[in-house]
From Swiss-Prot:
Subunit structure, interactors included: May form a heterooligomeric complex that consists of seven subunits: mnhA2, mnhB2, mnhC2, mnhD2, mnhE2, mnhF2 and mnhG2.
Name of the protein: Putative antiporter subunit mnhD2
Encoding gene per record: mnhD2
Residue intervals passing through the bilayer: 3-23, 32-52, 78-98, 108-128, 130-150, 161-181, 206-226, 240-260, 273-293, 308-328, 330-350, 368-388, 403-423, 450-470
Membrane topology classification: Multi-pass membrane protein
Pfam families associated with the record: Proton_antipo_M
Listed GO CC annotations: plasma membrane
Record organism: Staphylococcus haemolyticus (strain JCSC1435)
Amino acid sequence: MNSNLLVLPILLPLLCALVLVFTKEKNRLSKILYIGTMSVNTVISLCLLIYVLQHKPITLDFGGWAAPYGIQFLGDSLSLVMVTVASFVVTLIMSYGFGRGEDRVNRYYLPTFILFLTTGVIGSFLTSDLFNLYVMFEIMLLASFVLVTLGQSVEQLRAAIIYVVLNIVGSWLFLLGIGLLYKTVGTLNFSQVALRLDQIHDNKAIIIISIVFIVAFGSKAALVLFMWLPKAYAVLNTELAALFAALMTKVGAYALIRFFTLLFDQHTGVTHPLLVFMSCITMLIGAFGVIAYRDIKKVASYQVILSIGFVILGLGSNTFAGVHGAIFYLANDIIVKTMLFFIIGSLVYMSGYREYKYLCGLAKKEPFFGVAFVVMIFAIGGVPPFSGFPGKVLIFQGAIENGNFIGLALMIITSLLAMYSLFRILFIMYFGDNDGEQVDFNPLPKHRKTILGILVAVVLAMGIAAPVVMNATENATKLNMDDNYFHSIVNSHLKEGNK
């Protein structure tokens, strides 16, 4: 396969975003462009993933400049799983909204900046060096800053200030980590960094750099440093809340998985217990949040925080099963959290309220939502045969192999609390008493029900056909847990380029 195809998943959304600037007045044409572009992007990413699973990873050196001197993209099973899932959910998100009922500014500019954000996300998954990872993070964050602040309410502006400030601090830490690492090893290419870190005997320097990256990426993933997330997500409209929940924290978690399996595996006795500790704190924060709030958007926001704790617990176990579970659960959670925020946003749209006490009788009026809600709860809880089950079982196994029984117990307890918080909403939807206050539910557009139906089908399919998905995530785990395998791929490519 031509390695130049690897640039398409990032190039298509970028070009489409630029074209939309000139077609914003033509709503129908714009919709065809951005939905069509992301649909094609999903198909291309899936084809690249299938090729990689059947053959070998793809590397692309831009301008013919071989790494570590040039910009390099790496399409392996981990990056392409994430790119495929991300492209798929962005397609659904952009199909879900932005109709004539939207505010003029939102209708004109949201799709453009969503595509810019998608460009940064996909670039973060594909890049093979730290500086370009930083560049992609900044593209993603700048677009997200616009999306968060593109509102007219005081509540949204307040949430935007917190979001922007904390993410800028995280970016500074990321840049600081890059500077310290370059000073230590003299390169930023992933494979070169991995090789040279193994030769460094200054343990304190490596540990300090590792901790800087943990905090930097942890702030992006809402790992302990969660303050920006609930307020920001709660004030966004349905499409943006789903987009942020699906992708923003996942990029930080992806970076942690890449760094602490491929690069910083020299001092696992320090870094990985820290990751486990932070994951446990994050799970507790998420659990308290889902129980404490009656605002269903904030309940959903804390569900995002809780799931990040699960992913990092698997990574922190430093076992094959744990890392495999983290990767599977991360990919699955992109889809499940999209579904969660679509459902929550639809409930707010139909009832006009964010507190679940106003949802009394809705499930009886809209039985489809009752079914979709149950599927979502079981997927989040990791109940077989739903899609959350394989990932959680592997994370459980990793925690047991690592002897981390406290983390295991916390994961079980917080998973039950997560399910309880959602069953509480479901119970109100079926059996709640509105105490005489009648709420007239607005009908949900048919195309939005169709998209929810697609997500329900995908969640069920990922659970039932889990071995197919696990083939890709297991391959990704082998790649990231085996330094020699990764180096042999990159080095063989470099030799071919020098011939």
